């Protein structure tokens, strides 16, 4: 699988130049440029895992090296600092991002090598009855629960070579290799708290769309805890 790691250079120095009354401005600018990055990524059928804001990952399967080069250039034009990127390859998203991260920290120029494309398995997780619990708990306690679930899901996916992004509300987006799909099904087939829509596609955007389609079918069915759609 292919993962593009992207690092914003001199990001801390840029934030410090904004003065002491800067946190609101940093959040405003971060959200503004991430909105633009999501827009650019969608045009190339990928999806950014924004993670730390100053470092993020993109699923790159199904995208040519030429397209990646154009995408990186488009992102650079919309960011307040220079960026550095490197493409990593591995049997799983976790391994691919490790290799991309090592490459990112050990080479001077943006590097895009040719790697084999693999199908992508996207996972759209949703917590059952979480919206209802807001009637009986505080906003902050609900956030703590959401965070704890995120940690537990992250640990599970890490064990099987996957990566995870919190989407907001009670939704999470994961990526795994297609070989690990059965492990996810086994883990959540009897779970009455979490449902997972699984999508398998040739690129990240397609896989995510299919995962969301699967999740909607689970919600409509109300009997299953998982469903899978494949391109």
From Swiss-Prot:
It comes from the Archaea. Coiled coil: none annotated. One of its GO terms (molecular function) is GTP binding. Its EC number is 3.5.4.29. Signal peptide: none annotated. GO terms for biological process: biosynthetic process. It catalyses: GTP + 3 H2O = 2-amino-5-formylamino-6-(5-phospho-D-ribosylamino)pyrimidin-4(3H)-one + 2 phosphate + 2 H(+). Keywords: GTP-binding, Hydrolase, Nucleotide-binding. Belongs to the archaeal-type GTP cyclohydrolase family. Catalyzes the formation of 2-amino-5-formylamino-6-ribofuranosylamino-4(3H)-pyrimidinone ribonucleotide monophosphate and inorganic phosphate from GTP. Also has an independent pyrophosphate phosphohydrolase activity. This is GTP cyclohydrolase III. The lineage of its organism: Archaea, Thermoproteota, Thermoprotei, Sulfolobales, Sulfolobaceae.
């Amino acid at each position: 699988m292919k993962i593009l790691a992207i690092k914003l250079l001199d990001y801390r120095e840029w934030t410090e130049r904004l003065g002491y009354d800067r946190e609101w401005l940093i959040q405003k600018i971060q959200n503004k440029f991430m909105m633009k990055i999501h827009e650019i990524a969608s045009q190339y059928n990928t999806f950014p895992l924004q993670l730390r804001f100053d470092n993020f990952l993109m699923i790159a399967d199904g995208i040519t090296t030429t397209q990646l080069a154009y995408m990186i250039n488009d992102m650079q034009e919309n960011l307040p600092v220079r960026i550095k990127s490197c493409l990593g390859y591995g049997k799983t998203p976790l391994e691919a991002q490790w290799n991309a991260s090592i490459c990112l920290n050990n080479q001077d120029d943006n590097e895009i090598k040719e790697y084999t494309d693999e199908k992508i398995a996207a996972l759209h997780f949703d917590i059952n009855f979480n919206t209802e619990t807001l009637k009986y708990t505080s906003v902050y306690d609900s956030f703590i629960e959401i965070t704890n679930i995120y940690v537990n899901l992250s640990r599970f996916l890490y064990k099987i070579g996957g990566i995870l992004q919190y989407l907001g509300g009670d939704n999470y987006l994961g990526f795994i290799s297609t070989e690990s799909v059965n492990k996810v099904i086994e883990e959540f087939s009897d779970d009455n708290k979490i449902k997972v829509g699984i999508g398998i596609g040739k690129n990240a955007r397609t896989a995510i769309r299919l995962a969301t389609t699967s999740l909607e079918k689970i919600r409509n069915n109300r009997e299953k805890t998982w469903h899978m759609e494949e391109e």
